Amino acid sequence: MNEFKYLGKKVNKPSKQLDTFPKPKNITHVMFEGEELTCLCPVTGQPDFNTVVIEFEPDKLCLESKSLKLYLWSFREEAVFAEGLADIIVSDLFKALKPFGCKVTLMQNIRGGLQLTAVAEKKR
């Protein structure tokens, strides 16, 4: 089994490290969904609240969920548009997991009466 940096340990700060582990034999699709992804509007500095759906088709690796939580937490103080954030997340996940495909759907909470959904996808 892999050595996990965060799993089973007390952690009180965000991290950009994504821990992985070997994919179980019959797993073909993995999906995470969370409603607590926050970042800052790069124009106003106001917080943006997002729901994120992460899907990937693993080749050899799966993603350890605690490291993902800490990774998503790391954006709390970053100023970035939703479209840019979706692109950053899919790129980082693709680099760490080397999956057949990865898709990130980011749904920003309604602001000014508009619902924004940004989808970023990478495939081999």
Residues of each region from the PLM?
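N-terminal intrinsically disordered, cationic/polar leader segments
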Residues: M1-R124
